[in-house]
A protein has these predicted regions:
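Second-shell loop/turn segments in exported
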Residues: 23-31, 47-57, 72, 85-86, ...
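Extracellular/luminal Protease-associated
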Residues: 107-217, 223, 283, 314-317, ...
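Soluble metallo-hydrolase cores and metallopeptidase-like ectodomains found primarily
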Residues: 22-25, 106-140, 216-318, 334, ...
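Metal-dependent peptidase/peptidase-like ectodomains
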Residues: 106-107, 224-242, 355-462
Length: 520
């Protein structure tokens, strides 16, 4: 379907080649320069900002830098006279112990716990092995209050394993839900890839989780916890049963009870965390249109520091992710602010939105869209910029590597918005607009992985600009020295031209697409 839509858009965009360029727009787009981008990014992605992790001093420092820039540009502070929009967060850390037959296993080395909602201590002399957890395997088996060992891998129709993917599948998600409905004490989900995942991502897995603090918090959910475990732990759990875990795995069949001395405990520790989105407002000049607002967003947070004791560089600078997008909205803000000072202000208003907590689960944008300063009904679109300073895997060493950008979501809710983006590109920037990831069902799931999604789920049309992942994604190699500043500036100019057309058009983009099922 997306290829059909793209072909139609390109066919319809033939007239864009003759669209008249607006010299006023081009004048102010020129403010978005490689030098200006480098000036900002060299500061916010420096080691002094310590990777800008949400809730840490580096992120707070970045928020103040952005606010100071907004103030210098004359943008209005619309949060009760402030540029800072408080995002109340809770830090959730977990203490967990796990022993089998007196042998202790360490959280993050042999298992990890999907954040439980309650605290528990479990002591048992037996477990229930449920194979792949199919209905046939657990039929007539009472799992209430039991420690359940489950092979968390896919099983083909012929009964043989067909994959171990850690990423999961719809079938396994359904099995998990079904097993949880049986009210076990805990589910121990064994997967062959867990050992490697824990080796690579231990620090991330053990890091405290941030969630939005709920003012009307409901009583804690009492559903059972799920621990992902390695095959080594699974072998220890079943060894008294006369068969190895691999033999049980190959055998399948019905659920069975196995003697095992198991001790498990876990408890959560919570504390409040201070975090802010940064909002700068440029009011529109048209009395009839100024109440309509275009949002231009980027997240300024990143993933912070590697643990103390790490050899070499500890700072995840996040120059591309998303220092580049943050730099983009600051340069675009400068261009629009200068236009307004010169008497060419936008007809509609613009909200420049620096989001916090994106790396923690799109938290800042979620809180903003649930508690908007400007009604979402008045928000005509969100142009979200996340990673625009590098060349991704698929364009590396290609002839057009310095003249492309991935565009995601532009036509999912509004054909008008898609066409405006196409027209801006054809008229001014002439980049390759790659729609490869423009699909909510794309296995990379990029549509749901940045802040635009929280607008889209409320029915606000969006465009997500993205350069694709690269070898330094979420690593210490994401440095300013590797940024292609002319490419960053050109991508930001594309967003500027698209915004220029949106805020000055007679009509806002018509929403003719449907929100995803389950969206608000």
């Amino acid at each position: 379907m997306k290829k059909i839509i793209l072909s139609f858009a390109l066919a319809g965009s033939i007239t864009f080649a003759w669209a008249q360029q607006d010299p006023t727009a081009m004048k102010y787009a020129g403010i978005i320069s490689p030098d200006l981008a480098k000036k900002h990014l060299s500061i916010i992605a420096s080691d002094a900002y310590e990777g800008r992790e949400t809730g840490k001093p580096g992120a707070e420092k970045a928020a103040h830098y952005i606010a100071d820039e907004f103030k210098s540009l004359g943008l209005q502070p619309i949060v009760n006279g402030s540029y800072f929009f408080d995002v109340p967060l809770t830090e959730n850390s977990l203490n967990a112990t796990f022993a089998v037959g007196g042998k202790a296993f360490a959280n993050g080395d042999s298992f990890y716990a999907v954040q439980p909602s309650t605290d528990r201590v479990l002591n048992t002399s037996e477990i229930v092995f449920v194979g792949y957890g199919t209905d046939a395997e657990i039929a007539n088996t009472d799992l209430t209050g039991k420690i359940v060992l489950w092979i968390n891998e896919d099983k083909a129709a012929d009964g043989k394993p067909q994959g171990t993917s850690f990423r999961g599948s719809e079938a396994r998600a359904a099995i998990t839900k079904n097993l949880l409905s049986k009210n076990p004490a805990i589910i121990l989900a064994a997967n062959s890839e867990i050992a490697g995942v824990l080796t690579k991502y231990k620090n991330y897995i053990l890091a405290p989780r941030l969630t939005i603090k709920k003012e009307d918090a409901k009583p804690a959910d009492t559903k059972p916890a799920v621990f992902w475990i390695t095959n080594e732990v699974a072998e220890e759990l079943v060894k008294s049963g006369g068969k190895t875990y691999e033999q049980l795995k190959a055998g399948g069949g019905t659920a069975q009870t196995i003697k095992a001395d198991v001790k498990i405990s876990y408890n959560s520790v919570k504390k409040d965390v201070k975090a802010v989105d940064v909002l700068g407002f440029l009011p529109g000049s048209d009395p009839k249109l100024k109440d309509e607002v275009l949002v231009i967003s980027a997240h300024y947070d990143h993933i912070g520091l590697l643990p103390e004791g790490t050899k070499g560089d500890r700072v995840n600078n996040g120059a591309d992710d998303d220092g580049s997008g943050t730099t983009g909205i600051m340069t675009i803000a400068r261009a629009f602010s200068k236009a307004k000072k010169d008497g060419h202000g936008p007809r509609r208003s613009i909200l420049f939105l620096g989001n916090v907590g994106e790396e923690k689960g799109l938290l800042g944008s979620e809180y903003y869209t649930d508690h908007p300063v400007i009604p979402l009904a008045n928000t005509i679109a969100d142009l979200n910029i996340d990673m625009i300073g590098r060349v991704g895997y698929e364009y590396k060493d290609k002839a057009d590597s310095a003249n492309y950008v991935y565009v995601i979501g532009s036509g999912m809710l509004s054909t008008d918005l898609h066409n405006v983006g196409e027209k801006a590109n054809k008229t001014y920037t002439n980049m390759v607009l790659d729609y490869k990831y423009d699909d909510p069902k794309d296995p990379n799931d990029f549509y749901h992985r940045s802040d635009h999604y929280n607008f889209a789920k409320h029915g606000v049309p969006i465009i997500f600009y993205f350069n694709g992942e690269h070898a330094d994604y979420h690593g210490v190699g994401d440095e300013v020295s590797k940024i292609n500043f002319p490419l960053l500036a050109k991508r930001a100019q594309l967003a500027f031209y698209t915004a220029w057309d949106l805020v000055n058009a007679d009509n806002r983009p018509v929403v003719d697409g449907k929100k995803e099922e389950g969206s608000k």
